[in-house]
């Protein structure tokens, strides 16, 4: 009987295949090959849609699988990376997506079975790509709440794809090139549903791609935050692919190997793309690097991504032969939560304070702001809580006059674009389950659901618990059942024990993901039966810690002092005393105001005695004495207030950040780098008196800030959400300056120039292009965005009809380089000489110098990052600067061509010498 993948991986290192796209390019396929007879009349360009070859040239795909199997691959990956409706919509082939997935799996299954033996079984991994859209980021910098793709749509598309892959014979599901963990969650969710429907145990293989030198995903998460996000799921393996070669990828693989409780996979590119978009690593140079992974015990699965072929895989198989595989880490013994960063709830954390102020039921100010749709100011409340030390931010939108689902989605989407807030996990708080699920579908990190209970019985309770697990969250469990809210110690522990058994035994929830709320209730209310509420909570906390292993305890602390509304000092002092005692007994979460000013150790001894008598219910007259104390303090505060007013005391101003002490130019630059728009209006008004023209402010301090952003992003010290935030700040600055700029202009034009943006034909990636478009628009350029997969003919036509001043070409994949040359050729043929700016992951200055500039009479300039575009565009729009720039580029390109020729000559001489070497053993 054939061994399963789960069995084989325990004994040896598994060999995965290499790149599919690289291999397909070697066949020199043309448009007709992709179309076949079936798609001969479909509009648009089909070349580059590799997945459709499963239907039109299955012989090519089977041949590629065969080559990898012959090279020693244990797992071959289906040619279905983009076989989802979302991805195929770019080609108008949505209705063929399922068939592509089905046939892709069948082709791979047929090839694998032909080579599979009892000694060396071969497996098929169904490839599931991330699509070219993201659930976690806005496509519109001016509207951070917007999303181009929602979780529910993506889930349904993935469900269709994965069902087809399993039907076609896939042994496992490989969710690869993950750049947004929320997209990955949808794929995991769909895989688990297919497993339930089919009764199959489907290994879930997760492969992430990091986008910068800091090791973050494109959506901003660190690798340990990603691990936390998926920690509730039955992941088989986790690893990295794409972005880097083996050498650059190694530190991140080490990080995963040291933290992940899963098998580790790595399939790097054949090095980094060279100046021509190719890859310089060979099987012989890559194998030793892969050998380091293996010898250091870092990996269980090894393969190749962009630029690798069957020759690489053959070398890897030789290198891995007989070597010991990586031993996965133990499952974490502490709770993992995450936003953009990990929150590991270790004993050292002691207490997780959950910020309570983003709650429409608990903050009148927050409610007012949400009702007014003043999200910008509402966000500052969340930001202040994090700055004050909140480790989690609670969000509640339950108000009768609000559309709670829509407001929850909107606010969570907005704070996801604020890195200084999004770094911490969120607590999605609602009494309505549809609001909870709406929130869960917006969050890429591992959040907390607040809450579920047995109020409606076990069936509803278990259904809600399964939803929590489906979305990979932790959960607050209220001590509330069919009989009502638990108010005594006995009822609290009865409900907690029952709920714990149901969650761990019936739905298999990890106890570490369970947070009990034994109900913090108001004390000192004047009703004797309420006096022991705090004591019973603390006793229940101790019992839960001793009897329900792994579980945590939380509570809404402000409920305790409800009777003393209006006297903040007494309320905060009560909370401090309560938390001091509850934390000692095991309370490790609490919904609190992180800006509280009263600490337990700062309370005067005489006050502390009264407060502890109340909280611990030590004396019958404690409540009366606390009321007297509250009155005394209130009178003292009023006297101080009246005295200050009579003496004309100046209002205490809010502390300003250090950078606010700099001159206005420096403040503007720093505000951009930090993405802080709060002071923009006042700073620009001051700058208008210091600079001759409004546009000088853009070209001076604002562009200085954007340059710094570009440099920080380039060296991995900023990540994409931060860059987008700075772009949004820039846009606000430009909007403030716009009336002044228009007033300065003599001819009434309202733009700095018109730029035509396009991702070239054959490439469906648009994130980089979108960022450039935003940055250009922020710098007062009119942007005509043609989208993705744009043929050269359309670019030329639009350049003429739109009277563009320049063209921006974007491309992420290697074939895009050839297409950029084609665009320049078509521009030249049409008699156009508009400046062309090119950018994207595979582009380079050397490629421009060697391939594009020589065939185009206009200026062609390579742009390293988004922040450089407006700087270059400014030079192109100034006739004198443009001529000077053209001369600089001509000289630079001539020098690069000479360097390249000299390098090639040196290589040629080396090859000649090797071929003429003396054969001593002939």
Predicted regions and their residues:
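Domain-level signal for soluble alpha/beta catalytic cores
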Residues: 1-922
């Amino acid at each position: 009987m054939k061994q399963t993948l789960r069995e084989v991986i325990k004994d040896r290192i598994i060999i995965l295949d290499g790149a599919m796209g690289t291999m397909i390019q070697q066949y020199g396929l043309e448009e007709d090959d992709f179309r076949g007879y079936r798609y001969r009349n479909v509009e648009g360009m089909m070349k580059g849609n590799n997945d459709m070859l499963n239907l039109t040239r299955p012989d090519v795909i089977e041949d590629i699988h065969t080559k990898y199997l012959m090279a020693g691959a244990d797992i071959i990956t289906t040619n279905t990376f983009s076989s989802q409706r979302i991805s195929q919509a770019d080609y108008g082939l949505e209705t063929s997506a399922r068939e592509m997935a089905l046939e892709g799996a069948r082709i791979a299954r047929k090839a694998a079975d032909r080579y599979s033996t009892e000694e060396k079984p071969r497996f098929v991994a169904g490839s599931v790509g991330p699509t070219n859209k993201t659930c976690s980021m806005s496509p519109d910098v001016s509207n951070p709440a917007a999303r181009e793709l929602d979780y529910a749509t993506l889930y349904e598309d993935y469900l269709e794809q994965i069902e087809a892959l399993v039907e076609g014979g896939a042994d496992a599901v490989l969710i690869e090139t993950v750049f947004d963990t929320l997209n990955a969650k949808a794929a995991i969710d769909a895989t688990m549903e297919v497993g339930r429907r089919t009764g199959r145990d489907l290994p879930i293989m997760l492969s992430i791609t990091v986008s910068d030198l800091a090791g973050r995903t494109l959506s901003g998460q660190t690798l340990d935050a990603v691990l936390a996000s998926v920690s509730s799921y039955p992941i088989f393996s986790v690893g990295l692919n794409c972005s880097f070669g083996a050498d650059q990828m190694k530190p991140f693989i080490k990080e995963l190997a040291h933290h992940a409780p899963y098998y580790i996979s790595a399939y790097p590119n054949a090095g980094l793309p060279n100046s021509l978009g190719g890859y310089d690593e060979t099987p012989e140079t890559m194998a030793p690097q892969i050998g380091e992974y293996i010898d250091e015990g870092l990996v269980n699965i090894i393969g190749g991504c962009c630029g690798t072929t069957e020759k690489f895989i053959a070398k890897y198989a030789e290198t891995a032969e007989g070597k010991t595989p990586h031993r996965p880490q133990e499952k974490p013994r502490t709770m993992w939560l995450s936003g953009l960063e990990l929150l590991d709830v270790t004993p050292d954390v002691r207490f997780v304070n959950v910020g309570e102020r983003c709650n429409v039921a608990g903050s009148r100010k927050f409610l007012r702001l949400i009702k007014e749709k003043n999200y910008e100011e509402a966000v500052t409340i969340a930001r202040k809580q994090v700055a004050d030390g909140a480790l989690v931010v609670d969000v509640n939108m339950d108000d009768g006059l609000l559309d709670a689902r829509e407001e929850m989605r909107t606010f969570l989407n907005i704070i996801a674009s604020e890195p200084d807030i999004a770094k911490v996990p969120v607590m999605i708080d609602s009494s309505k389950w549809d609001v909870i699920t709406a929130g869960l579908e917006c969050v890429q990190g591992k959040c907390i659901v607040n809450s579920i209970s047995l109020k409606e019985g076990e069936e509803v309770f278990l259904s809600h618990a399964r939803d929590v697990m489906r979305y990979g969250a932790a959960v607050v469990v209220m001590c509330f059942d069919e009989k009502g809210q638990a108010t005594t110690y006995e009822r609290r522990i009865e409900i907690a024990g029952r709920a714990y058994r149901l969650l761990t035994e019936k739905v298999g929830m990890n106890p570490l993901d369970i947070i009990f709320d034994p109900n913090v209730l108001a004390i000192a209310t004047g009703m004797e039966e309420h006096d022991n509420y705090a004591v019973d909570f603390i006793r229940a906390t101790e019992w839960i810690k001793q009897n329900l292993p792994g579980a945590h305890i939380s509570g809404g602390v402000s409920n305790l002092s409800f009777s003393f509304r209006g006297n903040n000092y007494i309320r905060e002092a009560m909370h401090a005393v309560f938390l001091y005692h509850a934390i000692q007994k095991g309370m490790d979460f609490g919904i609190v105001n992180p800006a509280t000013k009263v600490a337990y150790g700062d309370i005067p001894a005489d006050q502390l005695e009264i407060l502890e008598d109340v909280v611990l219910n030590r004396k019958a007259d404690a409540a009366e004495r606390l009321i007297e104390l509250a009155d005394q303090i209130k009178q003292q505060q009023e006297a101080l207030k009246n005295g200050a007013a009579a003496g004309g005391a100046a209002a205490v101003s809010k502390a300003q950040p250090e950078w606010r002490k700099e001159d206005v130019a420096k403040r503007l630059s720093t505000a951009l780098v930090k993405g802080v728009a709060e002071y923009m209006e006042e700073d620009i008004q001051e700058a208008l008196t210091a600079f001759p023209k409004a546009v000088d402010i853009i070209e001076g301090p604002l562009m200085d800030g954007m340059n710094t952003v570009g440099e920080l992003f380039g060296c991995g010290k900023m990540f994409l959400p931060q860059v987008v935030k700075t772009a949004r700040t820039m846009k606000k600055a430009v909007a403030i300056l716009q009336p002044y700029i228009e007033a300065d202009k003599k001819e009434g034009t309202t733009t700095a120039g018109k730029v035509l943006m396009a991702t070239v034909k054959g490439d469906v990636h648009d994130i980089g292009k979108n960022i450039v478009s935003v940055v250009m628009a922020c710098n007062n350029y009119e942007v005509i965005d043609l989208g993705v997969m744009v043929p050269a003919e359309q670019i030329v036509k639009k350049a003429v009809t739109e009277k563009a001043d320049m063209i921006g070409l974007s491309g992420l994949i290697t074939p895009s380089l050839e297409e950029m040359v084609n665009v320049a050729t078509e521009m030249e043929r049409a008699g156009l000489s508009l400046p062309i700016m090119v950018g994207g992951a595979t582009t380079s200055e050397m490629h421009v110098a060697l391939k594009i500039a020589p065939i185009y009479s206009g200026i062609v300039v390579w742009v390293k990052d988004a922040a450089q575009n407006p700087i270059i565009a400014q030079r192109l729009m100034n006739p004198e600067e443009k001529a000077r720039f053209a001369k600089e580029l001509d000289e630079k390109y001539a020098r690069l061509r000479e360097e390249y020729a000299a390098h090639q000559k040196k290589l040629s001489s080396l090859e000649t010498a090797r071929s003429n070497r003396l054969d001593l053993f002939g």
